[in-house]
């Protein structure tokens, strides 16, 4: 009876995903995309994008396929200029291997200076490599804030896309939480009515 009453009450109390950095630099001033008004998985594959095929495959399989039906969910990969051909090849290869529609994967080219500026605005303890890339991806909420974990193990700013364990043990749950928060906010504001 108690379990029934709990679920029937319709009140869900869950831990919210902490904001680790407010106001990540919005890219709308330097590109046609934005980090606002959508839940964004933000990444930096770098000039050596062909070395990130495994990372992209892990993200596609474990995150994108699970959540891509959510209309306000996107992947944004910030890329150095002159990498469009490499990004297009990655998408073609991923389409061929996975039969996935990558319409919500956006590859945005920008100058090295702008790319580093966006990365630095995350204010993490992580660094870009010499090719202006990292295997880490980040969750940005619809207000443009970096979300992650801050617990007894310390702050977790990003998720290492090289390792399925990090994605499955941490990122999947965190994306579920941020999407649940978003749905609750929509419901509270009567967006569904």
Please give the residue ranges for each predicted region.
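Extracytoplasmic
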Residues: 36, 70-73, 132-135
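Sec/Tat-exported extracytoplasmic proteins
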Residues: 63-67, 122, 126, 175, ...
